[in-house]
Amino acid sequence: MQYYQIWCNLRDSHRDLEFCENVRAYLGHLKDAGKIEGFTITRRKFGFGPSELGEFNITISTRDMEQLDAAFSMVAPREGRLEELHRAVYSMVTDFRSGLYRDFPDPERVGASKP
C-alpha cells in the first residue's frame, strides 16, 4: 500500500466539522471512482505533535503508485464537479505539508518476507 499523507491547519478552526464533511465528500468521490482505496482524517489531540505538521492529518491509501497516479490524473484538469469538491477543501487549508509513505518492507524489497 501507498499512503499519501497530508498535514494542515485550518484558516478558521471554528469550521472544523465543515472541513471534515468537505474532505469526506471529495475523497469519497475519488474512492467511489476507484481512484483510491480509502482515507482517514485525524486531528492532533491536546496539542501534542510537531507544530510544523499541522493540526489535521489526512491519510489517503492506494494499492500502488499506478492507482495514486490515476487519482492525480483525475484531479489535474481542475474542472467540473471534482474541482468544486477539491476547492471546498483546499480553500479552508493553510500550512499544507505532504509526504508519501509505503508499507515496509514492501514486496519489491529483495529479501522481504511476505505477511
Task: Report residues per predicted region.
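Active-site-flanking beta-strand signature of metal-NTP-handling nucleotidyl enzymes
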Residues: Q2-N9
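Short intrinsically disordered coil segments
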Residues: E21, S73-P77, S113-P115
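Short, solvent-exposed loop/turn elements at beta->coil junctions and helix N-caps
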Residues: T42-F48
